[in-house]
């Protein structure tokens, strides 16, 4: 359980590295017991061009990344999966819930479950890509720009249901959904 580890619970900038290192060390021990010599994971070509500190742990531990090694992008992986009849091909990405909080904000199950419940409400009501990013008492809704009008049309119900979960201030991010939005500013701080 990653949140049992203080170094991860404190949510540092290298949280993903620490978590992946822990996860893959555990998997490596299990694989060794089973006689498995090679472990592979799902990093793709696109992941190599954005802030992904977990990739460092993958490389350090000698885990293979066949999709990235083949130069396959996320879209190419989705197309291949669809061609093979794999249902996950059309599923929206679901990154770690810790990405919904700013670095340094302490992680705990209660807040992560609350964010997850809020995202599920938004998925049911407006669909598409949805993230709730929590900044203290402000929760920022990220969704696809083409879903803004639907979000505003259902504004009162969205606000009511999110407040029932305990969110105080609810905003719609006019930049829309974007992967890695909590990493904005890391380069200027020399942390990416």
Region spans (language model):
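Short secondary-structure boundary segments
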Residues: 1, 43, 174
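Short secondary-structure capping/turn micro-motifs that flank functional sites
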Residues: 3-5, 47-48, 97-98, 138, ...
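Active-site adenylate/phosphate-handling loop in enzymes that bind or generate adenylated species
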Residues: 4-90
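Short secondary-structure transition/capping segments
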Residues: 7-11, 51-54, 101-104, 143-144, ...
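Short, hinge-like loop/turn segments at secondary-structure boundaries
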Residues: 14-17, 56-59, 107, 150, ...
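Peripheral terminal appendages
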Residues: 35, 117-192
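Mid-to-C-terminal catalytic subdomains of enzymes
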Residues: 68-74, 78-122, 129-130
